[in-house]
Swiss-Prot record:
GO terms for biological process: protein autoubiquitination. It comes from Mus musculus. This is E3 ubiquitin-protein ligase RNF133. It is an enzyme of class 2 (transferase). Interacts with E3 ligase UBE2J1. The keyword Zinc applies.
Length: 382
């Protein structure tokens, strides 16, 4: 037999969670690899009067398909008011001494690939694309087609406009782009969605199992308390062992209304609070299942001080009866512990007879036989 088919859910839980963790780890690794970006160090230099000013900072981000290498050149924007370089006929004012140059292009109007293609056809060594107006210095790794030997970098709108204003004032601006640091974006939108669903599922099942454990703990306490109460309550009910000569074992006497069998010597009977008695093995499960006397419908458990819903707890009470209550005692032990002396029975057991006997017969009957007469003699089941 395959042990995997016979193992319990608890034994399979560690393997299940290990498999789930491995799956999450693989997904996260894939997401992280796809979301790895490289920053760009940019050294921007320009002349102001007789002074040479430069600014160095990690202000750019390489495109996803850009080659990662160092590049330097003069910054050249498109000619005219439209700076997005989406038109294939876009022109650039190239340096006179044929210096390497890098195109400065505004984002928007077309795809990034189109902008890069226009600049590369004019001989640009690299392309710097600055973001939309109103985005500040926000940048992100651009998705574009790969171009051979072309460096593609995005910078913020503020930095791009500063460079553009300097160039429009006639300032000669050069830039050197170097590969910066590698950054891994752990939480892209796919991974975030997956984690949200997974976390919500785990939270639901965790809450569900905690609630089940809490309810089970309360039920366990309830049944333990009920067991103690039932032990105490059933200990209050009298138990008697029938003997030869008792009126109850007479062939003409009434039988047990539960099993419909006649009473026999050495059988154990339990006397209820209503003074009716039956076979102990018959009446105990009956009380636990119905809670009442099968003859007069007296609420036995209520009379013993136990308040509960019998219909909801029938099966559990019967289990408690078989496992916890003193019904497991042998007949000898029950006779020793619970048998009532004949002299005391007369003060506690009443006699219910629909057809009273004559005074002559009553006078000729021994007192002991009178006291041990069946309390339910001549009664019908209600």
């Amino acid at each position: 037999m395959n042990p995997l088919q016979t193992s319990t859910w608890q034994n399979q839980a560690p393997s299940f969670w290990l498999l789930r963790f491995s799956f999450i780890w693989l997904v996260s690794q894939k997401c992280c690899t796809a979301s790895a970006v490289w920053t760009a160090y940019m050294n921007i230099s320009f002349h102001v009067g007789n002074r040479m000013l430069s600014e160095l900072g990690e202000t750019g981000v390489f495109g996803r398909s850009s080659i990662l290498k160092r590049v330097a050149g003069v910054v050249v924007p498109p000619e005219g008011k439209i700076q997005n370089a989406c038109d294939p006929n876009t022109t650039f004012i190239l340096p006179r001494n044929k210096e390497p140059w890098i195109a400065l292009i505004e984002r928007g109007g077309c795809a990034f690939t189109q902008k890069i293609k226009v600049a590369s056809e004019h001989g640009a060594r690299g392309v710097i694309i600055y973001n939309f107006p109103g985005t500040g210095n926000q940048v992100f790794p651009m998705s574009h087609q790969a171009f051979e030997d072309i460096v593609v970098v995005m910078i913020g709108n503020i930095k791009g406009m500063e460079i553009l204003h300097l160039i429009r004032k006639g300032v000669h601006v050069t830039v050197m782009v170097e590969v910066g640091r590698k950054h891994v974006i752990w939480l892209n939108h796919y991974f975030v969605s997956f984690m949200i669903v997974t976390t919500a599922t785990l939270a639901y099942f965790t809450f569900y199992h905690i609630r089940r454990l809490w309810v089970a703990r309360i039920e366990n306490r309830r049944w333990k308390r009920l067991t103690r109460e039932l032990k105490k309550a059933f200990g209050q009910l009298q138990v008697r062992v029938l003997k030869e000569g008792d009126e109850e074992v007479n062939p003409n006497a009434d039988s047990c209304v539960i099993c419909f069998e006649a009473y026999k010597p050495n059988e154990i009977v339990r006397i209820l609070t209503c003074k009716h008695f039956f076979h102990k093995n018959c009446i105990d499960p009956w009380i636990l299942a119905h809670g009442t006397c099968p003859m007069c419908k007296c609420d036995i458990l209520k009379a013993l001080g136990i308040q509960m819903d019998i219909e909801d707890g029938t099966d559990s009470l019967q289990v408690l009866m078989s496992n916890e209550l003193p019904g497991t005692l042998s007949p000898v032990e029950e006779e020793t512990n619970y048998e009532l002396p004949p002299a005391r029975t007369s003060s506690k057991v009443t006699h219910v007879q629909e057809h009273p006997t004559s005074s002559a017969n009553a006078g000729s009957q021994p007192p002991e036989a009178e006291e041990t007469s069946h309390p339910s003699h001549g009664q019908q089941v209600l």
